[in-house]
A protein has these predicted regions:
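Short catalytic/ligand-binding loop motif for oxyanion handling, primarily in non-cytosolic enzymes
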Residues: 73-74, 106-110, 225-227, 239, ...
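Non-catalytic interaction/assembly regions
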Residues: 2-95, 143, 149-166, 170-174, ...
Length: 493
């Protein structure tokens, strides 16, 4: 049978150079079974070797936004400017939206222990985003199972059972990943049974899907105050598959979810994408704790590898095993501790008034802890970030547009706590040379990196990055041609 998606992991017959025997006793296996197994492995390797003959790159526009909500409800705010990214033209709307939140609820003991409030607040944010996207974007009518937006010449690699036919119908959350309570919708990390009938349970009704709208919910996941939600344009639904969610608590005791991450993954065509929403340790002097949080999240977040031998239950996919990763959130890195709060304010305020002020902002960036730690290879060493050409996003007086330097309050030095970073497994500067004669487009390119000033409910400002991502799509006719050529040819183990 012609495979719809090529698994690029190690062939299941081999593991670290040692032979892995097929099920049952190898010596007693039927010869025809052994030959068939070996031929399948050979065919898999050859298809991967010749993938340039049947894969094509297409551009996917992705929005990644992060916001520390300071425990506030989203019901009374307008998030359209944030999601538009300064481009109100409907034609500028992105194909995929990933939104990360921190402190969706107050981080008190009751909310850390019980997940009910977190679930409700995650639903509120997801519904508001979906409603806003569908109001902003032009509505297109799509037939069920219809053509994708690339003209229908590509193979849809998504399995409808992988994500509830793309409608994001809600599942019970339960404990998710490593530490802390968590909940999900769209796809659970343990339950592979999907609701293909779109049943009208009370949980499903929490996530109305606006079936005639331009966008669909892919998945959502929360961990105490942390949440992540993802949406896709309706015309892209058939290209999405293998949606999974996970969490990692790294807070109190190294596992409680007051700090940590909620993550999701999905495939688009023949490319894999992961997004991580994280909230790292606070306080200006806790650089080492933040670095440790990052590494703990990297180790704890593991997704199920659904393409490996079914007998290998321990097989998993890490964050960095994906083609593209977006890491966003309140990373809590501050300005270096030896820079006084007063000096930070002086530099920021001069930036507003004089040409020299721009130099002041550049100097302040040089004192940013995350920039320093990355430069020394101690954290996010494989990730890239755009230039911080915007003012620090923390700490503001909620409801106002000014930094909180009130003398009666504990003054915090302004900082770029809220960040969006990205990673490309092929290399962050890699280009698409497939079918391009040796030159091509960068596999991932950041288009914009900015903060949004219109949202004032929090002591943080939202941040967003927009990206052009080159995803691989299978051209069915060409794949079939290569497959038939291999089947007709001679093969060797």
């Amino acid at each position: 049978m012609l495979p719809a998606q090529i698994n690029q992991t190690k062939p299941p017959m081999f593991h670290d150079g040692e032979e892995k025997l097929p099920p049952n006793n190898y010596e007693k296996a039927n010869n025809s079974f052994v030959l068939s197994y070996a031929r399948d492995e050979w065919l898999q390797r050859k298809l991967i070797e010749r993938e340039s003959e049947y894969l094509e790159f297409r551009n996917l526009k992705i929005f990644c936004g992060t916001f520390n909500a300071n425990g506030k409800s989203p019901t009374s705010i307008d998030i359209s400017k944030w999601l538009c990214g300064g481009e109100p033209d409907p034609s500028a709307m992105k194909d995929c939206y990933v939104c990360s939140f921190q402190e969706i609820v107050d981080l008190n003991a009751a909310n850390v222990i019980a997940e009910g409030h977190s679930a409700k607040r995650t639903t509120q944010w997801a519904n508001m985003i979906l409603q806003t996207l569908n109001q902003l974007a032009p509505i297109k009518i799509h037939e069920s199972g219809g053509r994708n937006d690339f003209g229908g010449s590509f193979d849809s690699t998504s399995n409808k059972d992988d994500w509830s036919n793309g409608n994001g119908s809600r599942e019970s959350g339960g404990s998710g990943g490593s530490g802390g309570s968590g909940g999900s919708s769209g796809s659970g990390e343990t339950n592979n049974n999907r609701n293909s009938n779109h049943s009208k349970s009370s949980e499903n009704e929490e996530h109305p899907q606006h079936e005639t709208g331009a966008y669909r919910l892919i998945a959502s996941k929360y961990l105490v105050g942390i949440a992540i939600v993802a949406f896709i344009k309706a015309e892209h639904v058939n290209n999405v598959g293998d949606v999974q969610v996970q969490t990692a608590g790294v807070g109190i005791g190294g596992f409680v979810g007051n700090k940590g991450a909620a993550a999701l993954r999905f495939t688009y065509g023949n490319s894999s994408i992961c997004a991580v929403s994280s909230h790292l340790s606070a306080h200006r002097g806790a650089v080492g704790s933040r670095n440790s949080d990052y590494n703990n999240i990297l180790n704890k977040v593991q997704f199920k590898d659904r393409h490996t031998d079914g007998n290998n239950s321990s097989s998993s996919i890490s964050i960095l095993d994906h083609d593209y990763v977006f890491w966003l959130g309140d990373l809590n890195y501050r300005i270096q501790v030896d820079i006084s709060t007063e000096e930070c304010y002086r530099r920021i305020r001069s930036n507003k008034k004089t040409e020299k002020g721009q130099n002041d902002l550049v100097w302040l960036r040089s004192q940013d802890q995350l920039n320093i730690e990355r430069a020394h290879g101690r954290v996010f060493e494989l990730f890239e970030e755009g230039v911080l050409n915007f003012l620090p996003t923390y700490k503001y007086i909620p409801g106002e547009d000014v930094y909180d330097d009130r003398p009666e309050k504990k003054m915090r030095a302004p900082a770029w706590c809220d960040r969006v970073l990205w990673y490309c497994r092929m290399g962050n500067n890699s280009v698409n040379t497939m079918n391009s004669g040796g030159s091509g487009t960068k596999l991932i390119k950041q288009i914009k990196y900015q903060r949004e000033n219109s949202i004032k409910i929090s002591d943080h400002k939202p941040v967003y990055g927009t990206f052009d991502v080159q995803v691989k799509m299978i051209v069915k006719q060409e794949q079939k041609r290569v497959y038939n050529e291999l089947m007709r040819g001679e093969w060797v183990i």
